[in-house]
A protein has these predicted regions:
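Alpha-helical solenoid repeat scaffolds
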Residues: 1-184
Length: 184
């Protein structure tokens, strides 16, 4: 809970003061993700490097953040760079989110990215953090907390329907098949 509250304080500080809090606690990769999104929100020039460092981090699977990097590139009119990254994604070996990203790029539907997430929207950023927390709880089979944080995340950004797969998986793991069907 300390990690959650401190990270949320950092976000609020950044949103309110338009800068990153200089004295902050380090929570490892969660802090890297949070700094990346804060820099994206603040439109800092080194934001792209933060995305690349996270995506290439060997300490875990951060492929989800390829979507946010492509989104960032599109918001900043770097379409050719976004196309290059999307072109490296494989439909078969990628998540639904990344496969959809590639499809949108290939079909020139760049505005679709902004319909579900924007670095300019503080609700979207906090929603993604809460989704990360939900995912962490789910990986520990703590589905009650996972669902709680998922619902907060979904409230802040109901347009990010790709996240519904997590709640469906949580229901499935709890053998709540009727709820899985409702989500799908």
């Amino acid at each position: 809970n300390l990690i959650i509250s401190e990270t949320l304080k950092q976000y609020v500080y950044s949103f309110k003061n338009k800068k990153i809090l200089s004295t902050k606690q380090n929570f490892g990769n969660i802090s890297l993700i949070s700094q990346m999104f804060q820099r994206c929100y603040l439109k800092e020039s080194n934001t792209g490097a933060f995305f690349v460092n996270l995506i290439n981090n060997k300490q875990g699977d951060y492929s989800r953040y390829i979507f946010f990097y492509i989104n960032y590139l599109i918001e900043n009119k770097k379409i050719e760079e976004a196309k290059k990254i999307a072109g490296q994604l494989e439909y078969i070996n990628s998540t639904l989110l990344l496969s959809q990203s590639r499809s949108w790029i290939e079909n020139g539907k760049f505005k679709e990215f902004n319909k579900i997430f924007s670095c300019n929207n503080h609700n979207d950023i906090v929603s993604e953090f809460l989704f990360l927390v939900s995912n962490l709880y789910s990986s520990q089979n703590d589905f009650e907390n996972s669902n709680f944080y998922f619902n907060l995340s979904n409230y802040l950004n109901p347009n990010f329907t790709f996240n519904l797969s997590l709640i469906a998986e949580n229901f499935y793991m709890n053998k709540e098949y009727i709820k899985v069907k409702e989500v799908l």
